[in-house]
Amino acid sequence: MKATHTFRLIYFLSIQFAHSQVFEVGDYISDLVGNICENGNDDWKFSFDENKKVLFISSFATWWKPCQSEAQTIEEIYKQFKDKDVEVMGAGIDWNQPYSCKEWAKKFQLTFPILDDSKGRQIYNYFGDGIVPYNVVIDRSGKLIYSDSGFKKQDIVNAIESGFKTPKTDSVYLKKKNPKSDNKTRYQILRKNKGYD
């Protein structure tokens, strides 16, 4: 019995360690890419130097009740900011448990683009801490200004509004780093520097 509890604790801690976020508030992000599975084109690329928008991404799992509860609130945020320089994205993992991407959008009447993040889990692994829902806001320069699990609508709205205060200039990340490097390289460097690899 004691060995079982020890195994469960070790397993839980290893899962938490494996899902430690790579990017933290204050880090600069370059381009993000993904596949849109609903409410948009197939391929999505967000470049802070080109788009110069605030980006809000919510990472979720379809089977988790808190993610289901927040879906309509994200739609409200999307409608509140859709005519401003804000891009709102959902990033789903674990599709078909119980909803497919299309069923998710239909069930919760969502009109913002939804990424299929289940294969590479780029969004989930870059920003999350192993807990969903996980929400991030990145300002117009590519700086991560909000990163938190759970759902705190007013904090997210405040972060989005704060993101507008950043001037529309070239990303500091790209000025400081090699423009040919990508997030995968940055991801590997950060993991190594933090002792994960």
Language-model features, listed with the residues they occupy:
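Bacterial Sec-dependent N-terminal signal peptides
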Residues: M1-E24
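Conserved redox-active cysteine motifs that mediate thiol-disulfide chemistry
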Residues: S59-E76
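A short beta-strand-turn-helix
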Residues: D31-V54
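Short pre-active-site segment immediately N-terminal to redox-active cysteine/selenocysteine motifs
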Residues: K53-L55, S59-W63, I131
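Hydrophobic beta-strand anchors of alpha/beta hydrolase catalytic cores
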Residues: F56-I57, V88, N135
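Conserved segment of the thioredoxin-like fold in thiol-based oxidoreductases
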Residues: Q72, K79-Q122, D129-V132
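Thiol/disulfide oxidoreductase modules built on the thioredoxin-like
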Residues: K107-L110, S118-S162
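Non-globular targeting/processing and membrane-anchoring segments
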Residues: Q21-I36, K165-D197
